[in-house]
Amino acid sequence: MSQNSLRLVEDKTVDKSKALEAALSQIERSFGKGSIMKLGANEKIVEVETVSTGSLSLDIALGIGGLPKGRIIEIYGPESSGKTTLALQTIAEAQKKGGVCAFVDAEHALDPVYARKLGVDLQNLLISQPDTGEQALEITDTLVRSGAIDVLVIDSVAALTPKAEIEGEMGDSLPGMQARLMSQALRKLTGSISRSNCMVVFINQIRMKIGVMFGSPETTTGGNALKFYASVRLDIRRIGAVKDREEIVGNQTRVKVVKNKMAPPFKQVEFDIMYGEGVSKTGELVDLGVKAGIVEKAGAWFSYNSQRLGQGRENAKIFLRDNPAVADEIETALRQNAGLIAERFLENGGPDANDSVGLDDA
């Protein structure tokens, strides 16, 4: 009896494997070789290429060393919080590795002088200032399909105005038109983005919902589609000012990883964005170094490997700026301990009401 049942199980297994082989060969005949495969058959599929954000602490918080290529990224926050700065820093980092980048300036507000100060190579940056949202997304689609672009930034979703709205009268009510435009565009783009290994960064603005009694009234523009298609969503906020005596020289910035398909989300980091300079790398090295025990702090003095960096945080930053070899040593040590730092020292923001609200249809 047991032999009969064993033979029956073996026959079923053989039948299943034959049926699977037949199905796979039929799919490959219909749609081409490689249209379906076992995930482990190609090791390259498992590895995700990344581009640094220009912020060491944010790279660590993202869990994979930066923003993933071949994915959709959303950066949103209030006005003057550092959204475009973060996107431009990402472009600069991609260009340092020989990447080709494009900037779709729907807001018509990109400052080339500021971009150059952040390290962007303007000679090799493609820029488009489209008239309508449809034109912007068509240009994006063409660039992505070319397979030649590494990072493409769209600034911003709120400025992607539908053609019907531009051709209409002031005050015309066209509810949900921008949301439909974004939904259709993302359906078309998502496959091309993955195949071309191009990172597409959407910058988005915040609006207030009227009549919200509980939870956060904040929402982002462009409908729900972007929220679902994005692999990483970053919420960036200005939380204070960086002062040199009485003069304000930068912003204290907090970034929360609201969504992350590549690693655990809700990590929260703080860093300085200096005017005309971008993310303060030396400030991050001092702060993260102290947290990780790589940089020693005794009273107001900072030291590394028995070498004094300076008295006070600003002097330590100046020392590291003047001694890049020491700064590189500290950065290497921090990146080697990235997992431990992310787990122990980066604040876990946890989901809040704003992370779970639906986006509006505007």
Curated annotation (Swiss-Prot):
The keyword Cytoplasm applies. Pfam families: RecA, RecA_C. GO terms for molecular function: ATP binding; ATP hydrolysis activity; ATP-dependent DNA damage sensor activity; damaged DNA binding; single-stranded DNA binding. Keywords: ATP-binding, Cytoplasm, DNA damage, DNA recombination, DNA repair, DNA-binding, Nucleotide-binding, SOS response. One of its GO terms (biological process) is SOS response. The keyword DNA repair applies. ATP binds at G77, P78, E79, S80, S81, G82, K83, T84. InterPro entries: AAA+_ATPase, DNA_recomb/repair_RecA, DNA_recomb/repair_RecA_CS, P-loop_NTPase, RecA-like_C, RecA-like_N, RecA_ATP-bd, RecA_C_sf. SMART domains: AAA. It is found in: Cytoplasm. GO terms for cellular component: cytosol. Can catalyze the hydrolysis of ATP in the presence of single-stranded DNA, the ATP-dependent uptake of single-stranded DNA by duplex DNA, and the ATP-dependent hybridization of homologous single-stranded DNAs. It interacts with LexA causing its activation and leading to its autocatalytic cleavage. Belongs to the RecA family. This is Protein RecA. The lineage of its organism: Bacteria, Pseudomonadati, Pseudomonadota, Alphaproteobacteria, Hyphomicrobiales.
